[in-house]
Amino acid sequence: MPESVIAGIPVHFPFEPYNVQRDYMEKVIICLRDGTNGVLESPTGTGKTLSLLCASLAWIRTRQSEHQQQMIKLKATSKEGGPGSGPGGDLSELAMTVGQANNWGVPKVIYASRTHSQLNQAMRELKRTAYANMRSVVLGSRDQLCIHPEVMKEQGNSNKVNLCKLRVHSKTCTFQLRVESKKDHPDFRGPSIMDIEDLVRVGQKLKMCPYYASKELVAQADITFMPYNYLLDPKARKANKIELGNTIIILDEAHNIEKICEESASVQIRSSDVAMAIEDVTHIMKVFTSGESQEAGGDEPKDFTLDDLTLLKEMLLELEKAIDAVVVDNPTDGTTYPASLMYELLGKANFTYGNCATIVALLDKLVQYLMVASQHMTIRKGGTFTMLSDLLTIVFANKENIMSKVHLSFKVHVQVEESNKQQGKSGAIQGKQQGWLGKGNITTTGTSSKAAKIVNFWCFNPGFGMEQLLNTQVRSVILTSGTLAPLKPLIAELAIPVAQHLENPHIVDQSQVYVKIIGTGPDRQQLISNFKNRDNPKYISSLGQTILNVARIVPDGLLVFFPSYPMLNKCVDAWQASGLWADISCKKPIFVEPRGKDQFTSTMEEFYQAIRDSKGAVFMAVCRGKVSEGLDFADRNGRAVIITGLPFPPLKDPKVILKRRYLETNRTKENQLLSGQEWYNLDATRAVNQAIGRVIRHRNDYGAILLCDSRFQDASQVQQLSKWIRGHLGARPQSSPFGPIVRELRQFFKHAEETMKQPDVREEEQPLMNVCKVEEVGTQPVIPTIKQEPGNNATFRKANKSAIKVEMANSINSWTPADYASAAGRTLGKAAPNAMDFMSRLDSNVSSIDFNCSGSADSGSGGCGSSSLVTIHKRERSSPGVTDTVATQTTKKRYKLAENIKTEPKSNSSQQVKVAPESRADFLRELRSLISQDQFRDFGKVLIEYRSGTDENFESLMTVLLDVLAAPKMRYLFIGMRRFLRNEHKAEFDVRLASLNLAQESSPNKRIP
């Protein structure tokens, strides 16, 4: 690999580095050499991660070589009888021994990022370099690395952690016991770089625990990869035995570092948590006194006594009483108190700095006891004890000698907890607040001090966490990301001394990027997604028309980012109702960002597959969502990005209000903190910068960035955009008329395709086979040349190819507003709704797509273009039924997607066995096309009721299923319903199905009720 000398250090880079990469590596090396801190911004696509790894490891390798030479020289001097011989010889030997034990004093690197996917990406980059032989390890969670089958069966990460600890403590985990004997195995020690997947694979091969084995590699590793929380959370650092002295800390993707620092120091406790903890302690005490302890926890001696339990219960009762006594003046929004309230509440219950460690140890023992007992009886598994342990650990991590700073940096916010809010049997509560506070769990009635409360202990000073990190005697801290600007307020908030800072330009030429502010749509309606205008039907329509016009021009992938899930959902609903959704789908199939992990992966795969088609695809996502954070849309995957608005945090959210108030109170000329309003604006702009960074991913990439909100014309807003974006907008950015933008955009892509190096030719789409079923609707088909047998002529194949693209778009149509519930309005203890959940789909206006052959090619309307043979007819739930739709189009054939069903001529003597579609969306579409609207309405109603979980609802469901799907021709759909039932009902379902088949065989002509 080419070698470049940068800041006096030879750096091996996979290719000749560009100037921006040289500048970046120079800043990194200077920080490491001088032991100082740096804040470095380099746009996504400039090789930031590669430069970071090569520069830091080149410096480490140079230091290793220098120290090795020093030790060799010292050893030689000692042997030659030099100054180190004789009485001083022992000193030389001691120096060499200590040097070897500490890798000759060479610092180690800790590379931290937000997610494991980002860490895996960094490790893949490392494998491409000349430093791939340097020792590295990644630290992951038990959820990712545990291979014990019993532990992995547990639901919830906390349960897995506790059961793992229990098995290790009791020496019953054979995988962990093999670590000592297998840790030097060549398969484990051989590879220099092993990511999560590598560790799991080797662990399964050697039947050795990957989680504990990875910790064996840390001591000898030159670079350790880990997520942020392992590094910034003192509790996690202690659990993972992470030593930070003389360590180089690299925080990649650090644009969210302030929030992460704040959240790692924040915690929450509910009245219901304390109440359940009291119940759990009481239960254990009853077991002790009733002689059931052998059945519950075995006959081995306990690590705690009845006196311990009695004392703990008394403390919890006092804590419950103290929380109940807190007055909430405003039941809707809650009441804010100084940080001292949290220490007062705990003090009243005798939780103090002095006994904190002892109580935390007791709580951990109780958790392990309940994990054992839960194997023999139905009880909670100690989630509330874990929550209490986290509370005490975080609150008392703030030492008494810095309490004055704690009072400035923290606030206690108390709100009313819904009386009917039950945490369930698991009792597992998340101790740390995630994201902005949701207000869905606040009741609006009553101010009684006896009402259940939620007590939030919130940190608003990210510098508090960073200061604790610096106090561990680290050598250097480097914060880096593609979107850190503006740097001054970031440095001021983190309150760390920064010697090196950098704002790199982009690696691409000006001609490779087209950036415009679109302040008005094609109809000259102002585009502004503020609170007053976001419900304006004219605005929503104009935004849809803008996206439609851009989709006609942009080749391949088009990304559209919305400020929030509710706004995305609102637009989707409006466009579906008006027909704009169908118009956009004609140009490109549409994908919408789901919120479930599994659905997200499959949706992304479908999107990438759709990009191979000549039409490309549209992906609609949300700022701060998964798509905007770290995903790669290089080349054809993302040729343009549309930003539809500024994603401001909820203005009236208590946490937002308190953050703004904290900044206004503590802002001085000396500390250069942002004002509350500046922070509020910057939080939105940083999310925009992240979304923009999805499209330009490397030196030869090109794309367009369209800012579809007139507020981007404000100079204050533009100044917070990344430096390379500001260069394209100029000193006084102005919105351009829509017409000229369309012409310029078309010319930009035409010029780019002619002059820029294009990626490899896309794979040709496989022809769509056996998915179009022709139903005879009228006696005079519009295109008589289309035959029943698919693929027999070019015209049919062309229509076929178009149909599958539109079908992919249709899979999104049945998503509902509930699937995109606002993060600000979500109940704190409630899981986010699953956008792909089968039951949730039944609450929506399920759309049906008919593929009708165009009958008027010369009319210029009603199709996807003059050459298209497929048109879309959208039918809402309130629209006429299938029979009505058919009746109005008696001269056409209707092509309806029926997955995996081959079209064959009907036979009176035999009938082909059908199988229900595997996709839930396809299942619903096919069912709806075969039954009446009233039947489908009844079907949806009982399915929604079935979710409540009672046997009566199962009986109601079966009654409707037998009424709707009992006919022989519908039997395949009846059978297909089985996979959507809960496990406890599947056996009964099989009995009903067998009875149904038997009745049909005995009376083939009799209708089954």
From Swiss-Prot:
Main localisation = nucleus
> Which keywords label this protein?
4Fe-4S, ATP-binding, DNA damage, DNA repair, DNA-binding, Helicase, Hydrolase, Iron, Iron-sulfur, Isomerase, Metal-binding, Nucleotide-binding, Nucleus
Q: What does this protein do?
A: A probable ATP-dependent DNA helicase implicated in DNA repair and the maintenance of genomic stability. Acts as an anti-recombinase to counteract toxic recombination and limit crossover during meiosis. Regulates meiotic recombination and crossover homeostasis by physically dissociating strand invasion events and thereby promotes noncrossover repair by meiotic synthesis dependent strand annealing (SDSA) as well as disassembly of D loop recombination intermediates.
Q: Name one GO biological process term.
A: regulation of double-strand break repair via homologous recombination
Species in which this protein is naturally found: Drosophila persimilis (Fruit fly)
* Enzymatic reactions: ATP + H2O = ADP + phosphate + H(+)
As recorded in UniProt, its EC number(s) are 5.6.2.-
Assigned GO CC terms:
nucleus
Q: Name the family.
A: Belongs to the helicase family. RAD3/XPD subfamily.
Q: Which SUPFAM superfamilies match?
A: P-loop containing nucleoside triphosphate hydrolases
Compartment(s): Nucleus
Q: Where does the chain cross the membrane?
A: none
Every Helicase ATP-binding domain range? 7-322
**What name has this protein been given in UniProt?**
Regulator of telomere elongation helicase 1 homolog
Which HAMAP family does UniProt cross-reference here?
RTEL1
State where [4Fe-4S] cluster binds.
146, 164, 173, 209
Record-annotated residues binding ATP? 42-49
One Pfam family assigned to this protein is Helicase_C_2
Extent of motif DEAH box = 252-255
Molecular functions per Gene Ontology: 4 iron, 4 sulfur cluster binding; ATP binding; ATP hydrolysis activity; chromatin binding; DNA binding; DNA helicase activity; DNA polymerase binding; metal ion binding
Q: Which PANTHER family match?
A: DNA REPAIR DEAD HELICASE RAD3/XP-D SUBFAMILY MEMBER, REGULATOR OF TELOMERE ELONGATION HELICASE 1
